[in-house]
């Protein structure tokens, strides 16, 4: 296995400069590349601010902060940026044609042994890999925002990714003090979005079908299901643009994995993107982030079985389709969604039989989308 020292990060936005920072903190030599010097100047400023803040808080010494900063070199020229790279982490916007264009350029200038890792939350890995001359050296890597704070990284091999590249990527994730979960098959949404995105839509259907209010559903999700915040609150925190994009990508890949609720598209079109725009499902004031008033009293008014059924059916689907196993799904849900209690533990408390019955009832009223996964049926 190669001794990894030199990393190039393509794209210096929020995710890109965050990944550059965590890599430099772990001791790697990092080249940060973008198409304009102005973008790089801004990114380097943000990295400096972030490191100085850590030093002020006493998390690292000022000397360490300066050393980390000095390990990141901003470069505009692509050929120069990848000249000594062993691993290239690409963090350009999630637009398939743009990614393919970047890889065509990259494939032409990078050394033949260089590994390419695409930071993506939903785009098909194999499809991008097949556009280059080295699909066996291509892998998906999904950091969560902000990379400096979020512990979880999904690692997604394409159909042709070599075992050596999978091992090396997982080693890299461990070296930057993150926890990796391996999504063994390149399925729509990978693990986290396969659980989270359909659940947002399901919460909208739940309002329509049960008459429960937003704060009742959110309170039940927080207090009964052990989420760190309500599902609508989490959607506002994530951003409707992100959810809308993930919905489209997942739906394009497989119409059976998601049943889009029209509300998401309407909110996206109306630019109600959540916290970042001041309004999503809830309204936010500019001055500071206010928590939505959720309570155990409100939670008692709502039975969240429809939502549990949805997320569990999707978790079971991941196992049945050999993309993951229960242990990895629980790890992903804990680190990526902040779940305080394992999903399948909650399911057993509610009763798998009750969940399967709920899915059967939903399927009889609303169609095949709700048919229970064979794994859940076998567990009851």
Task: Say what each PLM segment does.
Residues 115-194, 198, 229, 240, ...:
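Rossmann-fold dinucleotide-binding core
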Residues 32-49, 53-65, 155-166, 180-181, ...:
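Rossmann-like dinucleotide-binding cores of NAD(P)H-dependent redox enzymes
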Residues 39-42, 53-116, 122-124:
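Rossmann-like NAD(P)-binding element
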